[in-house]
From Swiss-Prot:
One of its GO terms (cellular component) is endoplasmic reticulum membrane. Homodimer. Homooligomer. Interacts with UGT1A1, UGT1A3, UGT1A4, UGT1A6, UGT1A7, UGT1A8 and UGT1A9 to form heterodimers. Isoform 1 interacts with isoform 2/i2 suggesting that oligomerization is involved in negative regulation of transferase activity by isoform 2. Isoform 1 also interacts with respective i2 isoforms of UGT1A1, UGT1A3, UGT1A4, UGT1A6, UGT1A7, UGT1A8 and UGT1A9. This is UDP-glucuronosyltransferase 1A10. GO terms for molecular function: enzyme binding; enzyme inhibitor activity; glucuronosyltransferase activity; protein heterodimerization activity; protein homodimerization activity; protein kinase C binding. Liver and colon. Isoform 1 and isoform 2 are expressed in colon, esophagus and small intestine; isoform 2 but not isoform 1 is expressed in liver or kidney. It catalyses: glucuronate acceptor + UDP-alpha-D-glucuronate = acceptor beta-D-glucuronoside + UDP + H(+); 17beta-estradiol + UDP-alpha-D-glucuronate = 17beta-estradiol 3-O-(beta-D-glucuronate) + UDP + H(+); 17beta-estradiol + UDP-alpha-D-glucuronate = 17beta-estradiol 17-O-(beta-D-glucuronate) + UDP + H(+); 17alpha-estradiol + UDP-alpha-D-glucuronate = 17alpha-estradiol 3-O-(beta-D-glucuronate) + UDP + H(+). The gene is UGT1A10.
Length: 530
């Protein structure tokens, strides 16, 4: 009987704990960004749903990757463009990357990307034109907004409905992250993301880093002009990028210092790099068969991401030629035209389980565009890389991994078949690359809390407390001259100059007095002698 009396309250306690968990449940509005950005954001949303929160996802009817089968409320709105329009504009942008890579905001502005960005930003106007949806959002009494800041619509929604926001991002162009969080970023050792410099810059690189920083301030307003015009129209007041980004409660940054260079951070910046890494699952039979057939040489995984569907024919043939000269089996995720010189060791697939393949012990190398998702999966699984960055932060990611000895970077526009062949043989045969990536993997995994759990905690924190004002620095309330202490410097300089002036005047007066008295004595002495 005593034993029964001891165990009987256990189910009741469990029920009470579960009840408490759901009593804490809140209401979250999610404004995601289309494309690969949604993949990892979705994992956070799904975990929040499992924890009992009421989640509402707002997305345009026209999208590539946005998932409508989530176990939550999904609200869609029509757009002024079709999926064909979106695909056409993106293909223009993607093809341009095979001709010239943007290494500054000005070059990005002058490229064909501006048309795609204008179309991309325009969907926010469509959201607010849907008065029924806006009224629903207004009456829903959300606790917070969970958003991707590259799509400024989430920031506009947060400001329009006066809701605390949790931002989910790898980084943002134009120093909007640093300015929005009021986080110092010394140009002497914090390189611009588009330049691909390390934190140990030469004098020439530091000069160029300053020039590009000034260029950002001059031209970023034009790159995001359409987005800011839409924001001003919706909010019915002139809006700057700082106005949108500066009200962020928590920044969930998909980075980690095994990839990022050490730099200043703010208390509302939470690092969740590697959130997309998962425990490897058993491979589909098709891929298991490829690996078994590869023998002792193993495999190489090749993917340039979900957004690159085709490569110019000449470049694709050069790549195929290089792949045919290594003994490994190459699994190439590619949906474009099959290169005519494709070797027997190279298998084209429309899709591959990238993380699961990278986690297989027979995987020898990873050919990647150095997107943050692929780079972190490579770090988590300890696979050295050959990196062929195309746009955005990819050049920066590649430089960081190369600096840490975890891979080789190739200029995809200039590389030859021989360059790719040599790079592959280097990362496969030189043990230092494997040792370096394994060291980074060990550092990355040595953490007290998993990135997904950390992200979920901070979203819930903002929901519970209606923001995180205690983490907001007073720098937001200062003018530019107060922030840089120019008024204090001016005051102290004025004091020093005043003291120096008074001291000089006193010395001059004393000197004149002494000299004048001495002169009168001499004159009196001369008159007596005469």
């Amino acid at each position: 009987m005593a034993r029964a009396g001891w165990t009987s309250p256990v189910p009741l306690c469990v029920c009470l704990l579960l009840t408490c968990g759901f009593a804490e449940a809140g209401k979250l509005l999610v404004v995601p960004m289309d494309g690969s950005h949604w993949f990892t954001m979705q994992s956070v949303v799904e975990k929040l749903i499992l924890r009992g929160h009421e989640v509402v996802v707002v997305m345009p009817e026209v999208s590539w990757q946005l998932e409508r089968s989530l176990n939550c409320t999904v609200k869609t709105y029509s757009t002024s463009y079709t999926l064909e329009d979106q695909n056409r504009e993106f293909m223009v942008f993607a093809h341009a990357q095979w001709k010239a890579q943007a290494q500054s905001i000005f070059s990005l502005l002058m490229s064909s990307s501006s048309g795609f960005l204008d179309l991309f930003f325009s969907h926010c106007r469509s959201l607010f034109n849907d008065r029924k949806l806006v009224e629903y959002l207004k009456e829903s009494s959300f606790d917070a907004v969970f958003l991707d800041p590259f799509d400024t619509c989430g920031l506009i929604v947060a400001k329009y409905f006066s809701l605390p926001s949790v931002v989910f991002t790898r980084g943002i162009f134009c120093h909007h992250l640093e300015e929005g969080a009021q986080c110092p970023a010394p140009l002497s050792y914090v390189p611009n993301d588009l330049l691909g410099f390390s934190d140990a810059m030469t004098f020439k690189e530091r000069v160029w880093n300053h020039i590009v920083h000034l260029e950002d301030h001059l031209f970023c307003q034009y790159l995001f002009r359409n987005a800011l015009e839409i924001a001003s129209e919706i909010l019915q007041t002139p809006v700057t990028a700082y106005d949108l980004y500066s009200h962020t409660s928590i920044w969930l940054l998909r980075t980690d210092f095994v990839l990022d260079y050490p730099k200043p951070v703010m208390p509302n910046m939470i690092f969740i790099g590697g959130i997309n890494c998962h425990q490897g699952k058993p491979l589909p039979m098709e891929f298991e068969a490829y690996i078994n057939a590869s023998g002792e040489h193993g495999i190489v995984v090749f993917s340039l991401g979900s957004m690159v569907s085709e490569i110019p024919e000449k470049k694709a043939m050069a790549i195929a030629d290089a792949l045919g000269k290594i003994p490994q089996t190459v699994l190439w995720r590619y949906t474009g035209t099959r290169p005519s010189n494709l070797a027997n060791n190279t298998i084209l697939v429309k899709w591959l389980p990238q993380n699961d393949l990278l986690g297989h012990p027979m995987t020898r190398a990873f050919i990647t565009h150095a997107g943050s998702h692929g780079v972190y999966e490579s770090i988590c699984n300890g696979v050295p890389m050959v990196m062929m960055p195309l746009f955005g932060d990819q050049m920066d990611n590649a430089k960081r991994m190369e600096t840490k000895g975890a891979g080789v970077t190739l200029n995809v526009l200039e590389m030859t078949s021989e360059d790719l062949e040599n790079a592959l043989k280097a990362v496969i045969n030189d043990k230092s690359y494997k040792e370096n990536i394994m060291r980074l993997s060990s550092l990355h995994k040595d953490r007290p809390v998993e990135p997904l759990d950390l992200a979920v905690f901070w979203v819930e924190f903002v929901m519970r407390h209606k923001g995180a004002p205690h983490l907001r620095p007073a720098a937001h309330d200062l003018t530019w001259y107060q922030y840089h202490s120019l008024d204090v410097i001016g005051f102290l300089l004025a004091v020093v100059l005043t003291v120096a002036f008074i001291t000089f005047k006193c010395c001059a007066y004393g000197y004149r007095k002494c000299l004048g008295k001495k002169g009168r004595v001499k004159k009196a002495h001369k008159s007596k002698t005469h």
